[in-house]
Amino acid sequence: AKDVMAVNYFALDERFGTVRPAYYVLSDPMFFRDSVCRDRVAELYRTLAEKVTWPMNLYVQYYNPERFDYRAALPNPNIRIVRFHTQVYRGFRGVEFWLYRHGLGSANFGTVVQVCEYVALLLGYKTLELYGVDHTLLDGLSVDDENRLCRADRHYYDDAPAVPKPIFQKVPHRPYT
């Protein structure tokens, strides 16, 4: 049997209970900060809390400025919450790599897939098989009539056509222009 690592909203997929991932990664700030996705995020946490009947490690960012309480959102004893660092170090290369190898820093990852690869390497995995990974980070980028950078974000679990939405810098929303 192979260990499986899942990300984002996979728990809402009907195959979640069959796949039974040993590891789960949430790295997008929408999972620990207030966002327009709050209802869907709440549904994800409810689903994880109710459906995980096996031991699973949930990897979340150590950075958590609003002090989101993962344990309160996930009162499931089968889920072990593990924090990973996202602090970017710029300096001596030897120190940088030492921090990376010990999980005390990261390389400013742009996608949850990169975070998964990093976590898997920290766990000691030498071979990784990636399934369903979409490497189209730049696809769907556009500029709207108000000169805001927008993205039509597509995922396998979304049936509706992707509509370009402004990409915001921070909470509160301030669009890239």
Positions of PLM-derived features:
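Metal-ion/cofactor- or nucleotide/acyl-coenzyme-handling active-site neighborhoods
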Residues: 1-177
